[in-house]
Regions:
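A residue-level structural signature of the nucleotidyltransferase/glycosyltransferase Rossmann-like core
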Residues: 43, 82-83
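Active-site donor/metal-binding and catalytic loop motifs
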Residues: 84-101
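Hydrophobic residues within well-ordered alpha-helices
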Residues: 74-75
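Acidic donor-binding loop at a coil-to-helix junction in glycosyltransferase catalytic cores
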Residues: 63-70
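Terminal low-complexity segments of carbohydrate-biosynthetic enzymes
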Residues: 80, 103-130
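A recurrent flexible, glycine/aromatic-enriched loop bordering the glycosyltransferase active site
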Residues: 9-19, 23-45
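Conserved nucleotide-sugar donor-binding catalytic segment
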Residues: 47, 54-62
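Conserved donor NDP-sugar-binding/catalytic core segment of glycosyltransferases
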Residues: 1-11, 80
Length: 130
């Protein structure tokens, strides 16, 4: 409940609107949001057969876009993300990000750029190794 969050220190802002349980409101807000529907690891799901078809996560990648890269290959396969910002509640617990490595993020971006240019669907370094 929103009232519990407010009683326990949550500061009232626009983000609280994502917690409103109203199908019409959620549908409208998902429709008007300016963010693109993308695959993000914190709140994603797919059919197992689709994940297998793209060979899962590229295990050469690390934090900093590895989830987006999987979603981009699903997109290349013809699987499109849905915008559910206001339909599927997701709360994030703050944590330090000591594992962030700029060089690894640059590598991830390079792989994503290659995949987009060449319409890559299946990774060689995923569930099944080639």
């Amino acid at each position: 409940k929103i009232s519990w969050l407010l009683k326990n220190g949550f500061k009232l802002n626009f983000k609280v609107s994502k917690l409103i349980q109203n199908k019409l409101f959620s549908f409208f807000m998902n429709w008007v949001t300016t963010t693109k529907p993308t695959w993000n690891g914190h709140n994603s799901s797919a059919y197992k057969s689709d994940i297998i078809a793209v060979n899962g996560f590229n295990e050469l990648l690390s934090y900093g876009g590895e989830d987006r890269e999987l979603g981009e290959r699903l997109y290349n396969l013809g699987i499109f993300s849905k915008q559910i910002r206001y339909s599927a509640i997701c709360l994030h617990l703050y944590h330090e990000r000591n594992y962030v490595d700029i060089e690894k993020i640059k590598f991830n971006l390079k792989v994503r750029k290659f995949n987009k240019k060449h319409n890559v669907i299946k990774t060689k370094e995923g569930i099944y190794k080639n």
